[in-house]
Every structure is written in structure tokens, then in C-alpha cells.
Amino acid sequence: LTMNVLFVCSRNQWRSPTAERIWRRTPGLTARSAGTSRNAIKTVTPELLLWADMIFVMEQKHKNRLVAEHRRLLEHKPLHVLDIPDDYHYMDPELITLLEQSTEPFLAPFIKK
């Protein structure tokens, strides 16, 4: 069984694609990313939320927006706020460290050795 993990930021430009890239080749996980903004590279859709077993958002505002727009789809999904500000570029080493440290405790049980 594979755990489907969705990472969400605003524009799907720096933070969530970095998280997707970090975890996408991990056995036991399937990672995707999207943004809450209408002009995101990939915008969050109901289909993506249904697909996801676990959702990580970078900031509280992303959770607020998802809940406002998709409350019923999120009722029984684990949704974690990482509190990672929009201060980093794609694959920034500091961003990678923050993402790994904040998500690994939740993802470790699902990683296949």
C-alpha cells in the first residue's frame, strides 16, 4: 500500500515542488504538489484532495483556504501546517532541511525499507 502525500503552498513554485521532489522517489510514498492560488503552476483540485491520504501545507493561510473551499473533502484527512515561510527558492538547502525535519516524523511509518 502506498501513502499518497500532497504538499501545498501558494503558487506551487518553490516550497511544495521542493517537498514533492524530496519525497517522490521514496518507497511507500507517492508525492504530488499544488498551490492554493488561482495562478499557481498546479492549482489544488478536489481530485487531488481526494487522491491524498495526507496533506502538508506550508502556512496556516493555506489550511484556511483549503478548509474554506473544500471542507467536506478534508473532514477525515490528516492535514499538517509546517509553518515554513515563502523565503526560499526551489531546492534551497535550508528549505530542504526544514521540509525533511518537519515532515519525516509523519511520513517515517509509511516508508518501506
For each predicted feature, which ranges?
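Phosphate-binding/catalytic loops
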Residues: V67-K113
